[in-house]
Amino acid sequence: MQILAPYLSRPDERGGFLGITQESWAEVNFIETRANQVRGNHYHKETRELFFIISGEIEVVIDDLNSGEHLELLFRKGDVFIIDPYEVHTFRTVTDAQWINMLSQAMDPQHPDFHQVAEKN
């Protein structure tokens, strides 16, 4: 997992401009989720994902299948992070939340790079 800082920030009297990423992404998605809901609990073998939180608070749990590292983080409006392949990621919305999700490769419905993990009891 990588937590990103903006590459450019230009506030002025009109509002502001925030540079999120200069990387190329193959797919861009908008996600809206009500408070206290869970999404994810899966990983990808090849796909990297960038997340940009537009509004709300989201608890993110990462379990790296390669290193065994376990992270629990809270993200808020304006936060940007990348999830790498083989990182199981689970999201729980603390509040209603909206975010942008970008994938390094477009999801192929015939052969999705999407691997669900069994829920823990």
Regions found by a protein language model. Give the residues of each.
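Double-stranded beta-helix
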Residues: 2-10, 27, 94-121
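A short glycine-rich, His/Asp/Glu-containing loop-to-beta-strand
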Residues: 10-41
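A generic "binding-loop/recognition-motif" signal
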Residues: 24, 46, 79, 87, ...
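Short, surface-exposed charged micro-motifs
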Residues: 30, 50, 90
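Short beta-strand His + acidic residue motifs that chelate non-heme Fe in jelly-roll/DSBH
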Residues: 41, 60-61, 83, 88-94, ...
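Glycine- and acidic-residue-biased ligand/ion/polar-headgroup-sensing regions
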Residues: 46-63
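Short acidic-glycine-tyrosine-enriched beta hairpin
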Residues: 65-85
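Structured catalytic cores of enzymes that bind and process phosphorylated ligands/cofactors
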Residues: 76-82, 91, 97, 121
